[in-house]
């Protein structure tokens, strides 16, 4: 008798995706972050669902409804802390996941990569509208500053901003629609994840060497299920440690004050995971130029497959590209630091230099390094 998991229409899909899936035998722990992102998504949807049961999307009661969740709802404090810090872990995992794809040349699976970039943009939109919901000072002013960037678009900008606000400023209508967006977007993300996996399983996983692994494959279960379970254990442990012992360390103290349109906080800044893009936005004195640079800093990921010049797929055996990759990583950390600093010297010039270096590394230096490495590998006799 044939096994049910191989014949049943639904079980067959699960079997071919998570059990009998042929996987390269040499994929490292850097490949764990895909499954961790899936776990993060499940955690966020579940905790978010329970928060939505008690939250009210009205400017008069939003802030106090969040306080009510933390004080009066059974384990409400834990659900909220897991949701708020879960977002940080989601971004930590996605940035490492993108970095791994960049380092090992996974972007040459173009469909999977492009869907991944769309996923990143959707996740950023979800996190942004979610940050507005508690209706604290930083929520309100963050929403005001970021949505105001739309007014930089020539001719239609102001109309577009007012259309998104549902009025002449960020107010009740904005909060209500942001809650609606924040509720629906995770389900759109889930659909995109399925498409992402569909395209991934068309080509199969890449591996650290970048060489075609078809000659040496092993079944996903039990080898990678147990490996993913270990990663999951680490993720849950660190998330619980953060949510239980230091839940507010990644947040902004200003968000403990209710939103006040008449009082601007001294330093308006987004959550830490947007600071690198915020630093790039601020490094250009012109409003429209800043918005374009902000968009370019994310959308540049779409053209990375076109900038691949090396004969080898992975950076594993390409020391020059490796060096540039880690300079890029350090540069992004620098931008994240600058994004959280006030707009004054020397932070302005550091931010401008780091922004120029970010685009230079991706658009010029890394493609040149690939060509140089090709030349170095050519026999010279």
Curated annotation (Swiss-Prot):
Tell me its family.
Belongs to the cytochrome b family.
Which CDD domains does UniProt cross-reference here? cytochrome_b_C, Cytochrome_b_N
- Residues that, per the record, bind a ubiquinone: 201
Entry membrane topology:
Multi-pass membrane protein
Is Transport included in the keywords of this UniProt record?
Answer: yes
Q: Which UniProt keywords apply?
A: Electron transport, Heme, Iron, Membrane, Metal-binding, Mitochondrion, Mitochondrion inner membrane, Respiratory chain, Transmembrane, Transmembrane helix, Transport, Ubiquinone
Task: Quote the record's binding site residues for heme b b562.
Answer: 83, 182
Q: Write out the transmembrane intervals.
A: 33-53, 77-98, 113-133, 178-198, 226-246, 288-308, 320-340, 347-367
Q: Which cofactor does it need?
A: heme b
Q: In the UniProt entry for this protein, what further remark is given in the free-text comments?
A: Heme 1 (or BL or b562) is low-potential and absorbs at about 562 nm, and heme 2 (or BH or b566) is high-potential and absorbs at about 566 nm.
Write down how the cofactor binds this protein.
Binds 2 heme b groups non-covalently.
Subcellular localization, as worded in the UniProt entry: Mitochondrion inner membrane
Q: Does this UniProt record's set of keywords contain Ubl conjugation? A: no
Question: Record-annotated residues binding heme b b566?
Answer: 97, 196
Q: From which domain of life does this come?
A: Eukaryota
Report the record's Gene Ontology biological process terms.
Answer: mitochondrial electron transport, ubiquinol to cytochrome c
Q: Which InterPro entries match?
A: Cyt_b/b6_C, Cyt_b/b6_C_sf, Cyt_b/b6_N, Cytb/b6-like_sf, Cytochrome_b, Cytochrome_b_C_euk/bac, Cytochrome_b_N_euk/bac, Di-haem_cyt_TM
Q: What is this protein called?
A: Cytochrome b
